[in-house]
Amino acid sequence: MFLNSLDLPGQPDNSRIVVAMSGGVDSSVVAGLLKKEGYDVIGITLQLYDHGAATHRVGACCAGQDIEDARRVAETLGIPHYVLDYEKRFREAVIDPFAESYAHGETPVPCVACNQTVKFADLLATARELGADALATGHYIRSRPHGAHRALFRPFDVERDQSYFLFATTQEQIDYLRFPLGDLPKAHVREIATEMGFVVADKHDSQDICFVPQGKYSDVITKLRPEAVNPGVIVHIDGQVLGKHSGIVNYTVGQRRGIGVATGEALYVVYLDVENARVIVGPREMLETHKLFLRDVNWLGDERLDNFPSDGLEMAVKVRSTRPSHLARLHYQEGVFSVDFLECENSVAPGQACVFYDGNGDGARILGGGFVTHSQRAVGVEMMLRRVLCNPETKAAVSSEFKTTASK
């Protein structure tokens, strides 16, 4: 049976493809390439949030100008283009959980939630309703046949690798999705956009979380969860109270800059004690992480969970999109996934994604991932943390801070 360039049966003109058009250069080129090949292309753009101050902000995605840019590209290509209002859904599925997670001292990854819900669930359902044979996006990741299904692999352009944000994609979704840019370098994508005469050819890439102006997470939390912005104290892991802070939402594990205390020692945020509004700080070595426990794991590997190797599986894992992967061993016992690092890793916070790969090399397969619930460090560090967390004197300092604030 003849398969076209998207591994669909028949000639391109027999396949209808919905393209998720964000208004950026990548998704525009996807629409252009597929249209050029002869596919029946339909463009869809999602309005995700109240544009506000972000409407004309350089480096934001999903802003108001993006919708207009997507419309103009679709017009250039002569394809149908629809704008769907997903603002309410986006707030419920992405923004509110992000704020809730941050208020609880976690470091969430909202782009994963957006792909997991709005883009690859809701939009995919819309594509099916339109009779599309596949949904194509401008993500830099590869999709290939693997046995009876398809699997995800790191892209050719490793500098643009977006696999970290796509680990939660289900097998059913992977089988329906297509990623035409997986084998292309970004520079070539821009060249194609120029050749096709797109107004977005020189447009800046999106960099910030779309609903977080200037990357200030605390501003969003303060607006959506004002009750979570409580003052407290900054405590050294040795138990010494170093100063005060105006809210834990201003901190994340591993942070060094902007802590708000000066001691002559390089200090990092080691732990966030949300219940007692304490920011625990210490030297960098206190951040070294040995083990992680995960929740909401999406397993895409070939091994059946009911027959998972008792000694685990060796693989590469990433805990931040911008960091290299590290060798680790994944375990699954009694419904719980855990990761033992075989190479040093640090600054891992609850809420972060931990993504699995079958190796460190280019083109490695994505085996799934999950979200960090908690981590384990060296025994000595864990003992110091427990000691300071149970210290009644620093708790008293927090209580005194609350009373002082209330009396003003």
Swiss-Prot record:
The keyword Nucleotidyltransferase does not apply. Its main location: cytoplasm. Keywords: ATP-binding, Cytoplasm, Disulfide bond, Nucleotide-binding, RNA-binding, Transferase, tRNA processing, tRNA-binding. ATP binds at A20, M21, S22, G23, G24, V25, D26, S27, L46, G138. One of its GO terms (molecular function) is ATP binding. One of its GO terms (biological process) is tRNA wobble position uridine thiolation. Its EC number is 2.8.1.13. Disulfide bonds join C114-C210. The record marks H139, Q352 as: Interaction with tRNA. GO terms for cellular component: cytoplasm. The active site is at C114, C210. It is found in: Cytoplasm. It catalyses: S-sulfanyl-L-cysteinyl-[protein] + uridine(34) in tRNA + AH2 + ATP = 2-thiouridine(34) in tRNA + L-cysteinyl-[protein] + A + AMP + diphosphate + H(+). It holds the Pfam family tRNA_Me_trans. Residues 160-162 are annotated as: Interaction with tRNA. It comes from the Bacteria. It is an enzyme of class 2 (transferase). Belongs to the MnmA/TRMU family. Catalyzes the 2-thiolation of uridine at the wobble position (U34) of tRNA, leading to the formation of s(2)U34. This is tRNA-specific 2-thiouridylase MnmA. It comes from Bartonella quintana (strain Toulouse) (Rochalimaea quintana). The gene is mnmA.
